[in-house]
């Protein structure tokens, strides 16, 4: 029985490398995967997932008008698994499409993404994945500043100063975001 998984974690928790590993494991057994990523994440190149350790792979970009269900339903042969990177950027309708892939096509879907933003508020995609996923799995990493578990994301400006207000989505990597614990989010030891 297929299920919808949401594997969430802070920045640097290994979400993208995990997608690449899962895809490799399926393909090593001659099984197919369909890989998707957000079309707004252009840090490396639209239509690719790229891990911080340098591995990169092509993926179908998702935009507002993308119908993920229709794309997957038309893939021949039917994929054995659907993998999504940057799933926090999904819209509510996209999450419903993922559930439909599981329920109607009987294909497991594994979505990876951040749970909360730099203000510690849920992203739209994460909110609906938390509500509709059959299984929730936390991917862990440590705080950038101390040894505690990182559960939040700290945004910094170009001068390295913490930012707690502003637009929810600003694409960036370690130059603007850090995985942090609750204590360091509230009072980061930045000079």
Curated annotation (Swiss-Prot):
Disulfide bonds: none annotated. Keywords: ATP-binding, Cytoplasm, DNA synthesis, Kinase, Metal-binding, Nucleotide-binding, Transferase, Zinc. Transmembrane segments: none annotated. ATP binds at residues 9-16, 85-88. The active site is at residue 86. GO terms for biological process: DNA biosynthetic process; thymidine metabolic process. GO terms for molecular function: ATP binding; thymidine kinase activity; zinc ion binding. It is found in: Cytoplasm. Signal peptide: none annotated. One of its GO terms (cellular component) is cytosol. It catalyses: thymidine + ATP = dTMP + ADP + H(+). Gene3D superfamilies: 3.30.60.20, P-loop containing nucleotide triphosphate hydrolases. Its EC number is 2.7.1.21. Pfam families: TK. Zn(2+) binds at residues 143, 146, 181, 184. It comes from the Bacteria. The keyword Nucleotide-binding applies. Homotetramer. NCBIfam families: PRK04296.1-4, PRK04296.1-5. Belongs to the thymidine kinase family. This is Thymidine kinase. The gene is tdk.
């Amino acid at each position: 029985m297929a299920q919808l998984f949401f594997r969430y974690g802070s920045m640097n928790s290994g979400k993208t490398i995990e997608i690449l590993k899962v895809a490799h494991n399926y393909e090593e057994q001659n099984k197919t995967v369909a890989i998707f990523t957000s079309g707004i994440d252009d840090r490396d190149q639209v239509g690719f997932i790229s891990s911080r350790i340098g591995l990169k792979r092509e993926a179908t970009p998702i935009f507002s008008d993308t119908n993920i269900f229709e794309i997957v339903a038309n893939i021949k042969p039917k994929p054995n698994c659907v993998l999504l990177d940057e799933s926090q950027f999904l819209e509510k309708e996209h999450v419903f499409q993922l559930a439909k892939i599981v329920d109607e096509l009987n294909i497991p879907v594994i979505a990876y993404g951040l749970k909360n933003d730099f203000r510690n508020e849920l992203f739209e995609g994460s909110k609906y994945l938390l509500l509709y996923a059959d299984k929730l799995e936390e991917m862990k990493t440590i705080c950038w500043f101390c040894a505690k578990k990182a559960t939040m994301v700290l945004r910094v400006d170009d001068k390295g100063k913490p930012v707690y207000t502003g637009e929810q989505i600003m694409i960036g990597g370690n130059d603007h975001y850090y995985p942090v614990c609750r204590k360091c989010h509230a009072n980061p030891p930045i000079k």
